[in-house]
């Protein structure tokens, strides 16, 4: 993270592990689900932090376990300032993280924290493609969600949530069309987990899933 030519700050928002990925309940117990979610974050940060263009990785979260894991990997941590009951907690957290990231970076990327199959080269290539646009995004494998949102010299203006791909498109962000299967494979459902069999996952996620079997 000490590349003098790096000019991008990456932000990841993580909710409390006890409240994360409830749609995985048919596959994992509550305790195992927390372990898997944390492991996916570890693998995501590990892949991302090796991208040469990144000057910093900042995780915004209210969860101490997630914060500790992020720090151990060399990421910065911002306690989530979002008040309880906020109508749009994810995008509020990302906007708060963007403010901090822009203290040192003109360009900011918001990345999902549940990309256990992410490869460093995929994110590096996507950032390279994103440089041609003020704002751009990469959809998830279903084409409806957003795995990453990029801003180069422009406000991030995040619209994550239901139908986020369409919302980002309508906001003027350009859709990037590269072949980045790991970058597109965020995990929300048991079917998403099963789809990882064709891609492979990072070591932390592999261990967490193996312990659950």
Curated annotation (Swiss-Prot):
Coiled coil: none annotated. One of its GO terms (biological process) is F420-0 metabolic process. Phosphoenolpyruvate binds at residues 146, 161, 164. The keyword GTP-binding applies. InterPro entries: CofC (IPR002835), Nucleotide-diphossugar_trans (IPR029044). It is an enzyme of class 2 (transferase). It catalyses: phosphoenolpyruvate + GTP + H(+) = enolpyruvoyl-2-diphospho-5'-guanosine + diphosphate. Keywords: GTP-binding, Nucleotide-binding, Nucleotidyltransferase, Transferase. Its EC number is 2.7.7.105. Pathway: Cofactor biosynthesis; coenzyme F420 biosynthesis. GO terms for molecular function: GTP binding; phospholactate guanylyltransferase activity. Guanylyltransferase that catalyzes the activation of phosphoenolpyruvate (PEP) as enolpyruvoyl-2-diphospho-5'-guanosine, via the condensation of PEP with GTP. It is involved in the biosynthesis of coenzyme F420, a hydride carrier cofactor. Belongs to the CofC family. This is Phosphoenolpyruvate guanylyltransferase. It comes from Mycolicibacterium vanbaalenii (strain DSM 7251 / JCM 13017 / BCRC 16820 / KCTC 9966 / NRRL B-24157 / PYR-1) (Mycobacterium vanbaalenii). The lineage of its organism: Bacteria, Bacillati, Actinomycetota, Actinomycetes, Mycobacteriales.
């Amino acid at each position: 993270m000490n590349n003098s030519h790096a000019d991008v700050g990456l932000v990841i928002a993580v909710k409390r592990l006890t409240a994360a990925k409830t749609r995985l309940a048919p596959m994992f117990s509550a305790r195992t689900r927390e372990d898997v979610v944390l492991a996916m974050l570890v693998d995501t940060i590990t892949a991302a932090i090796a991208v040469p263009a990144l000057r910093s990785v900042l995780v915004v979260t209210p969860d101490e376990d997630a914060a500790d894991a992020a720090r151990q990997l060399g990421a910065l941590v911002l306690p989530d300032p979002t008040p309880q009951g906020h109508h749009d907690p994810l995008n509020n957290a990302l906007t708060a993280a963007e403010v901090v990231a822009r203290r040192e970076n003109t360009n900011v990327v918001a990345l999902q924290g549940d990309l256990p199959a992410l490869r460093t080269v995929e994110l590096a290539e996507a950032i390279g493609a994103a440089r041609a646009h003020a704002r751009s995004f990469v959809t998830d494998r279903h084409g409806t969600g957003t795995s990453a949102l990029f801003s180069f010299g422009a406000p991030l203006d995040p619209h994550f949530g239901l139908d986020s791909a369409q919302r980002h498109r309508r906001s003027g962000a350009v859709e990037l069309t590269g072949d980045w299967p790991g970058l597109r494979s965020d995990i929300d459902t048991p079917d998403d987990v099963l789809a990882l069999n064709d891609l492979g996952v990072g070591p932390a996620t592999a261990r967490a899933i193996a312990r659950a079997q």
